[in-house]
C-alpha cells in the first residue's frame, strides 16, 4: 500500500465523495464508521461507486476510542488523515450536547493524540464548519471573521478547530482545518 489515507465519517456526503476522489487517484482508503452502523445501513449507499473497490477498507471504530484509533493507524500506516466524522445535526446538538461535544471536540483531540503519538509526519485535515460563525452576519466569512457559535454543535466544532491550531503550533504537526459551508 503506497498511498494510504484514513477517512473518518466515510459514509457521509463529504467522506464518500473524498473516498471516490482518492481511490480514483490510486489511494488505498481506510474508512471508519461507527460501530452501530451495519453494512446494509442506508448510509452505505453514499459509497455505492466504490464499495466493491479493492482499494477501500472499512473499519468500525468510535473516534473517542483511543485504542481503536491507534490500532487502525498503526495497522494501515496512513500518510493522510481526513477527519469528517461528526455528530452533524445542529438541532440534535441541543438535545444531546454531551454526546455532540464528546464526538465533535474530544474525538478530534483523541485523533490528534493518536497521530502525534504514532506518526507525527501524518498530514491531518479537520473538517470545520460555518456553524462556528453562528449569528455573525459578516460577508464573506473566512478564517479572519469573528467566531460566534450559537449551538452546541458550533461550539464543539470551534473548540476542535482551535485544538488543531494548538497541536499544529505546539507539536509542529501538519494539522489543518478547512471551514466547510453547505
Describe the function of each predicted region.
Residues 1-181:
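N-terminal Rossmann-like NAD(P)+-binding domain of SDR-like oxidoreductases, especially those catalyzing
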Amino acid at each position: 500500500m503506497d498511498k494510504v489515507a484514513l477517512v473518518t465519517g466515510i459514509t457521509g456526503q463529504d467522506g464518500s465523495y473524498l473516498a471516490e476522489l482518492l481511490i480514483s487517484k490510486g489511494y488505498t482508503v481506510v474508512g471508519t464508521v461507527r460501530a452501530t452502523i451495519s453494512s446494509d445501513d442506508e448510509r452505505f449507499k453514499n459509497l455505492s461507486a466504490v464499495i466493491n473497490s479493492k482499494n477501500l477498507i472499512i473499519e468500525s471504530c468510535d473516534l473517542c476510542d483511543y485504542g481503536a484509533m491507534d490500532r487502525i493507524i498503526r495497522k494501515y500506516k496512513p500518510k493522510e488523515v481526513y477527519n469528517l466524522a461528526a455528530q452533524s445535526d445542529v438541532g440534535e446538538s441541543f438535545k444531546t450536547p454531551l454526546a455532540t461535544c464528546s464526538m465533535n471536540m474530544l474525538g478530534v483531540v483523541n485523533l490528534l493524540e493518536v497521530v502525534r503519538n504514532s506518526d507525527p509526519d501524518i498530514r491531518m485535515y479537520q473538517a470545520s464548519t460555518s456553524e462556528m460563525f453562528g449569528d455573525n452576519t459578516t460577508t464573506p466569512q473566512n478564517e479572519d471573521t469573528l467566531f460566534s457559535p450559537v449551538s452546541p454543535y458550533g461550539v464543539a466544532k470551534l473548540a476542535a478547530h482551535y485544538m488543531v491550531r494548538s497541536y499544529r503550533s505546539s507539536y509542529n504537526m501538519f494539522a489543518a482545518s478547512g471551514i466547510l459551508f453547505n
